[in-house]
Design a protein with these regions (language model features):
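Catalytic phosphate/metal-binding cores of nucleic-acid and nucleotide-processing enzymes, i.e., regions
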Residues: 1-65
Length: 65
């Protein structure tokens, strides 16, 4: 699975299906489905900080790449 890395993120909220992520790369926090987070991601739950790794497909759909 191809992946896309977004550095210096923070999870500010989580649900059973998604996390709400803040990043300097986003104008506003973005919801990211758990199913689109790559196993190499450093963030998974509320309070986590680090690099977010998502599928390349999801990043393309969001206009991040």
């Amino acid at each position: 699975m191809s992946q896309h890395i977004i550095e210096n993120c923070k999870v500010i909220k989580e649900t059973s299906k998604a996390i709400l992520v803040e990043s300097d790369e986003f104008d506003e926090p973005e919801w990211v489905p758990q199913s689109q987070i790559h196993e190499d991601s450093e963030i998974w739950k509320e309070g986590d900080e680090g690099d977010l790794v998502v599928t390349e497909w999801f990043a393309e759909q969001k206009g991040w790449i």
